[in-house]
Amino acid sequence: MLRLFYFSAVIASVILNFVGIIMNLFITVVNCKTWVKSHRISSSDRILFSLGITRFLMLGLFLVNTIYFVSSNMERSVYLSAFFVLCFMFLDSSSLWFVTLLNILYCVKITNFQHSVFLLLKRSISPKIPRLLLAFVLISAFTTCLYITLSQASPFPELVTTRNNTSFNISEGILSLVVSLVLSSSLQFIINVTSASLLIHSLRRHIQKMQKNATGFWNPQMEAHVGAMKLMVYFLILYIPYSVATLVQYLPFYAGMDMGTKSICLIFATLYSPGHSVLIIITHPKLKTTAKKILCFKK
């Protein structure tokens, strides 16, 4: 029964990854066409373009790895497995940093705080987006290299199982995993929660202001607040279980877990990227309009 449940989880994971690949290809193509036509691109669309490419490569790599694992007639190469893991870690970290930057941009641009730091960020963040994207790629590369370095020095063993159920030890330390992932993920989590909290606080202040002035609640600023807040909150709902599931999958004792636990981790780890990509499309006016045209849902 558990084997059937795990097999169903693998099938669902593959389907979700196909959906994610299509969604991120759509995001990338739409923003690329806009960039080519107008010879300019907004800061948020530049981040979405980078995010779409990164997630497309990451989900494609996951599918290649899954197909290789299922269909290969040879024993699984330890070095090829390590290559898949390292590439996935780099792309995953980059995509999470891009989402974090997107949330920061929404928070800074939409909130109406008059603090000098916010006013400075409002003026200066957009021109710095390309350099920030590059900086986050370098941070992701650094954390991946840190993982490699620590894994070589760590004494903790890990079991890797081949297709013929032969197990052997490789030096893949739990310490290296925890340090490299926590360094990146904890900071991302703090920034995203802070951005969402500031946006909610700004929305509450805006509502109170509208109540005092006896004006209508729903206006362009309110719509921007609510749209960005929904995207951030849904992102956190998807991101928290995803982070836990991904961390568990990388741990040495994951191979010895029961099929039920593996199935749950697989579903949570797979649901985040496609789910968040769909949310981006339905909350982004241009992407939503283009998607409706493609699906023939014109009003």
Curated annotation (Swiss-Prot):
<feature type="topological domain" description="Extracellular">
    <location>
        <begin position="1"/>
        <end position="9"/>
    </location>
</feature>
<dbReference type="GO" id="GO:0033038">
    <property type="term" value="F:bitter taste receptor activity"/>
</dbReference>
<feature type="transmembrane region" description="Helical; Name=7">
    <location>
        <begin position="263"/>
        <end position="283"/>
    </location>
</feature>
<dbReference type="GO" id="GO:0004930">
    <property type="term" value="F:G protein-coupled receptor activity"/>
</dbReference>
<feature type="topological domain" description="Extracellular">
    <location>
        <begin position="68"/>
        <end position="81"/>
    </location>
</feature>
<dbReference type="Pfam" id="PF05296">
    <property type="entry name" value="TAS2R"/>
</dbReference>
<comment type="function">
    <text>Gustducin-coupled receptor implicated in the perception of bitter compounds in the oral cavity and the gastrointestinal tract. Signals through PLCB2 and the calcium-regulated cation channel TRPM5. In airway epithelial cells, binding of denatonium increases the intracellular calcium ion concentration and stimulates ciliary beat frequency.</text>
</comment>
<protein>
    <recommendedName>
        <fullName>Taste receptor type 2 member 4</fullName>
    </recommendedName>
</protein>
<feature type="transmembrane region" description="Helical; Name=3">
    <location>
        <begin position="82"/>
        <end position="102"/>
    </location>
</feature>
<dbReference type="GO" id="GO:0001580">
    <property type="term" value="P:detection of chemical stimulus involved in sensory perception of bitter taste"/>
</dbReference>
<comment type="similarity">
    <text>Belongs to the G-protein coupled receptor T2R family.</text>
</comment>
<keyword id="KW-0919">Taste</keyword>
<keyword id="KW-0675">Receptor</keyword>
<feature type="transmembrane region" description="Helical; Name=1">
    <location>
        <begin position="10"/>
        <end position="30"/>
    </location>
</feature>
<keyword id="KW-0325">Glycoprotein</keyword>
<feature type="topological domain" description="Cytoplasmic">
    <location>
        <begin position="284"/>
        <end position="299"/>
    </location>
</feature>
<dbReference type="GO" id="GO:0016020">
    <property type="term" value="C:membrane"/>
</dbReference>
<keyword id="KW-0297">G-protein coupled receptor</keyword>
<dbReference type="GO" id="GO:0007585">
    <property type="term" value="P:respiratory gaseous exchange by respiratory system"/>
</dbReference>
<feature type="topological domain" description="Cytoplasmic">
    <location>
        <begin position="31"/>
        <end position="46"/>
    </location>
</feature>
<keyword id="KW-0969">Cilium</keyword>
<feature type="transmembrane region" description="Helical; Name=2">
    <location>
        <begin position="47"/>
        <end position="67"/>
    </location>
</feature>
<feature type="glycosylation site" description="N-linked (GlcNAc...) asparagine">
    <location>
        <position position="165"/>
    </location>
</feature>
<keyword id="KW-0812">Transmembrane</keyword>
<keyword id="KW-0716">Sensory transduction</keyword>
<feature type="topological domain" description="Cytoplasmic">
    <location>
        <begin position="103"/>
        <end position="131"/>
    </location>
</feature>
<keyword id="KW-0472">Membrane</keyword>
<feature type="topological domain" description="Cytoplasmic">
    <location>
        <begin position="194"/>
        <end position="230"/>
    </location>
</feature>
<feature type="topological domain" description="Extracellular">
    <location>
        <begin position="153"/>
        <end position="172"/>
    </location>
</feature>
<feature type="topological domain" description="Extracellular">
    <location>
        <begin position="252"/>
        <end position="262"/>
    </location>
</feature>
<keyword id="KW-1003">Cell membrane</keyword>
<keyword id="KW-0966">Cell projection</keyword>
<feature type="glycosylation site" description="N-linked (GlcNAc...) asparagine">
    <location>
        <position position="164"/>
    </location>
</feature>
<keyword id="KW-0807">Transducer</keyword>
<dbReference type="InterPro" id="IPR007960">
    <property type="entry name" value="TAS2R"/>
</dbReference>
<feature type="glycosylation site" description="N-linked (GlcNAc...) asparagine">
    <location>
        <position position="169"/>
    </location>
</feature>
<dbReference type="InterPro" id="IPR030055">
    <property type="entry name" value="TAS2R4"/>
</dbReference>
<feature type="transmembrane region" description="Helical; Name=4">
    <location>
        <begin position="132"/>
        <end position="152"/>
    </location>
</feature>
<feature type="transmembrane region" description="Helical; Name=5">
    <location>
        <begin position="173"/>
        <end position="193"/>
    </location>
</feature>
<dbReference type="GO" id="GO:0060170">
    <property type="term" value="C:ciliary membrane"/>
</dbReference>
<feature type="transmembrane region" description="Helical; Name=6">
    <location>
        <begin position="231"/>
        <end position="251"/>
    </location>
</feature>
<keyword id="KW-1133">Transmembrane helix</keyword>
